């Protein structure tokens, strides 16, 4: 998870957001560890105090100093895969471009490298061929759902939108080939 800090993502609502995220963390820390990305050391200290005050099990929280652009890691975070034969884990590190909507996403693109290094899991950068040069594929984790048995559920609007185009020139067949290769 990432601790909320970008007030522009929640116009007029930001003051309520830390409390909502805090409640989620409180529920989670009753049963499991939470890895929490926080902007800087000062914010880590303030966040720790706040979470302790609302009853979170602080011993189940691992704080990571890492600046992010927004808190929604479902889309910007890593995709974990497990090889069914040898149980080896890998991370698919897609490029994230904030839904082709916002200009601030560079920090979010550092999340997967941090997680890969912290967990000591190999990271793969899915690439596409475009104009005779290799480019990373832009993808949000929330754009698809995979059952681990060769079936995948995709969001056409997300992947093939001309208004918020993720991968210029990509067609349906390109995404089919991409998922066939990496998933």
Residue ranges of predicted features:
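The feature marks the mature, well-folded catalytic cores of soluble enzymes
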Residues: 2-183
């Amino acid at each position: 998870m990432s601790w909320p800090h970008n007030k522009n993502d929640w116009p007029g609502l930001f003051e309520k957001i830390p409390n909502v995220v805090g409640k989620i963390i409180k529920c989670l820390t009753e049963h499991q560890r939470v890895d929490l990305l926080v902007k800087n050391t000062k914010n880590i200290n303030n966040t720790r105090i706040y979470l302790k005050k609302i009853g979170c099990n602080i011993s189940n929280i691992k704080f990571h100093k890492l600046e992010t652009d927004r808190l929604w890691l479902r889309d910007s975070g890593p995709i974990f895969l497990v090889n069914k034969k040898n149980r080896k884990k890998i991370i698919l590190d897609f490029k994230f471009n904030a839904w082709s909507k916002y200009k601030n996403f560079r920090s979010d693109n550092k999340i997967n490298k941090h997680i890969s290094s912290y967990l000591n899991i190999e990271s793969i950068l899915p690439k596409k061929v475009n104009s005779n040069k290799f480019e990373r594929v832009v993808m949000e984790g929330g754009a698809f759902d995979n059952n681990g048995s060769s079936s995948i559920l995709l969001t056409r609007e997300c992947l093939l939108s001309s208004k918020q185009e993720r991968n210029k020139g990509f067609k349906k067949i390109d995404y089919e080939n991409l998922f066939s290769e990496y998933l």
